[in-house]
C-alpha cells in the first residue's frame, strides 16, 4: 500500500528520445497534460456519448535537440532527427527546460501524480537522469503511476487468474483499439501519445484512481536510467 498522500492533480507524461535504455538516450520531446482529480472522477462525454478530454487541462510540449545521436529505429518511429531539431534551432534539455517544467508543475494543485505508460521502465528513469544531470528536483511529494502494470494488474484481478486477458496486448495502440474500436491519432509523437494515454485512463478512471491511491510510487524512489559521467555516485 502506498504511504504517499492522495494526489490532487494527475500529470500525464510521454517522452520521445534518441533510443532505448541500452544506448543511454536523451530526451528529444516532452509532453505533459495536467488534469485535476475532479475531472477524472467525472469524465466528460460528447453528444454521442463518446469520451472527450476534460475541458480544463493544462498542456506543455517541448522539443529539444539532444547531444547524442538518434538510433535509426528511434528516428524512424518518432519522425525526429538531430538534423531536423538543429535546423529548427532547438536547444537541448537544459536549465530553461527545467525551469519551464518546474513552473508548469508549480501551477498545479498538489500533490501531483505523474502518469506514464511503461513509465517505471522508461519515462520516469529517463526524466530522472536528465534532471539529475542538471541538479534539478521535482516537488518532494510527487508520486508516479505506471499504467502498464496497473492495467495488467486490474485485468488479472477481473479475470480471477485466467489467461484470457494475458494474451491481449498492452501497448497504447492495443489498449486504445480494444477500448474505442479505433486507431489512436499521432502515435509516437509525445503529445499524441499523451492524448491517447489520457483517453485510456478516462475509460477506466475509477479503477485507476483507486490503484494510484494504493500503489503510486514516490518520485524519490525512482532511480535514474543512467548516471552522467561526472556524477559523484560513480566515484569508487
From Swiss-Prot:
Predominant subcellular localization, coarse grouping: nucleus
InterPro entries: Exonuclease_RNaseT/DNA_pol3, RNaseH-like_sf, RNaseH_sf, TREX1/2
pH-activity dependence text: Optimum pH is 7.5-8.0.
GO cellular component, one term: nucleus
A GO term, aspect molecular function: protein homodimerization activity
Co-factor note (free text): Binds 2 Mg(2+) per subunit. The second magnesium ion interacts with only one residue. Substitution with Mn(2+) results in partial activity.
Enzyme class: hydrolase
Annotated substrate binding sites: 16-17, 122, 193
Record's keyword terms, sorted: DNA damage, DNA repair, Exonuclease, Hydrolase, Magnesium, Metal-binding, Nuclease, Nucleus
Reported impact of residue 188 to A: Loss of enzyme activity. Almost abolishes enzyme activity
Binding site for Mg(2+) 2: 14
SMART domains (alphabetical): EXOIII
SUPFAM superfamilies membership: Ribonuclease H-like
EC number per UniProt: 3.1.11.2
Binding positions (Mg(2+) 1): 14, 16, 193
Catalytic activity: Exonucleolytic cleavage in the 3'- to 5'-direction to yield nucleoside 5'-phosphates
Effect caused by changing residue 123 to A: Almost abolishes enzyme activity
GO biological process: one example: DNA catabolic process
Domain of life according to the entry: Eukaryota
Localisation per UniProt entry: Nucleus
Tissue specificity: Detected in heart, breast, prostate, skeletal muscle, testis, uterus, bone marrow, colon, small intestine, stomach and thymus.
Self-association state and partner proteins as the record states: Homodimer.
Sequence similarity: Belongs to the exonuclease superfamily. TREX family.
Free-text function comment from the UniProt entry: Exonuclease with a preference for double-stranded DNA with mismatched 3' termini. May play a role in DNA repair.
Name listed for the protein in its UniProt record: Three prime repair exonuclease 2
Organism: Homo sapiens (Human)
Gene name of this polypeptide: TREX2
